[in-house]
Amino acid sequence: MTEFIPLGTLYHALPSPFQMKRGGVLHQAHVAYETWGALAADRSNAVLIVTGLSPNAHAAANQANPEPGWWEAMVGPGKPIDTARWFVVCVNSLGSCKGSTGPASVNPATGALYRLTFPDLSIEDVADAAADVVRALGIAQLACLIGNSMGGMTALALLLRHPGIARSHINISGSAQALPFSIAIRSLQREAIRLDPHWNGGHYDDTRYPESGMRMARKLGVITYRSALEWDGRFGRVRLDSEQSEDDPFGLEFQVESYLEGHARRFVRFFDPNCYLYLSRSMDWFDLAEYVDDKPAADMGIDSPGADALPAAKSETGVSTASTVLAGLARIRIARALAIGANTDILFPVQQQEQIADGLRAGDADARFIGLDSPQGHDAFLVDFARFGPAVRDFLQGC
């Protein structure tokens, strides 16, 4: 098991013990982060980015690490998230293998890797850890909180559990709860990893590594990150050249198969399998409707003035419904918000971003929804900067 930590990573020590939502406790845990730009004297220009499942904190090149980051086109001087104006912080998720404490880290109590002894991880834990970084930097209130994909979930949890932490919010291809389709896909990804004999109940190493399981999990993910429209336009039914195709009668034959294989092989050794399992499951568990019931907000760890005045909206069976999710979102207090998505996203359908805007608006936010006609599905925010960039830039100019 390996941690994959970029050059220039900064660390924040979490409170010890760090209490987790599902009952676990971490001791001597830390969170990795990076920064760009300069913090204003009154600390009013801070922007926090919380990420999807796999990215590290290196969103863009900076003085400590000049290598391009995973959101290079979006973060930097003169870019949509303009570091000439904003002090930008990007936090690596708790539970990851990119610098923050997770299953691939050493348990200080035993001196051995956590592996599957790592406590149950929730999106709320990821949010609480990120909030602690903000407080440690002396930032009373963020100018804007930006979350994409899983980070959209993290951002909503952060806003709900830490009222007043941000003046505005951009939610990009995020959701207020995991839908059955995305849960089903992630369950298959986890099953592929766990069925690999080299996974060995989480006890693998570099020589006996669940490469086949990770490769299959990544292929399933990539299929859902893009859209059928893009697959058709990019690959069609084009076959590999004879020298590229395999002798195996059921081997790679089409270009799209080769693309998936190459993408998967590049990923499998750069993300820890156990971390993948934990973060994946945390997304399935997330549901803002949990915060709408007969309990006072204080009993749920929420210090939100007026949150208890909102009506309960659980169905008679206790199963969350669209109205419960909206009621959960309406408990969030934020001045301005923007929810953006791609109309071709099948993993976090654009209706979920529209729901976020509707729910935040019900909580008196000036909230706007934008559905973009990008062919690139869920991953559009990582590649379709011509569409996503202007929307983010325009919103931040009003902050």
From Swiss-Prot:
One of its GO terms (biological process) is methionine biosynthetic process. The record marks 186 as: Important for acyl-CoA specificity. Keywords: Acyltransferase, Amino-acid biosynthesis, Cysteine biosynthesis, Cytoplasm, Transferase. The active site is at residues 149, 345, 378. Transmembrane segments: none annotated. The keyword Acyltransferase applies. It catalyses: succinyl-CoA + L-serine = O-succinyl-L-serine + CoA. Residues 52-55 are annotated as: Important for substrate specificity. It is found in: Cytoplasm. Residues 45-384 form the AB hydrolase-1 domain. Homodimer. Belongs to the AB hydrolase superfamily. MetX family. Transfers a succinyl group from succinyl-CoA to L-serine, forming succinyl-L-serine. This is Serine O-succinyltransferase. It comes from Xanthomonas oryzae pv. oryzae (strain KACC10331 / KXO85). The gene is metX.
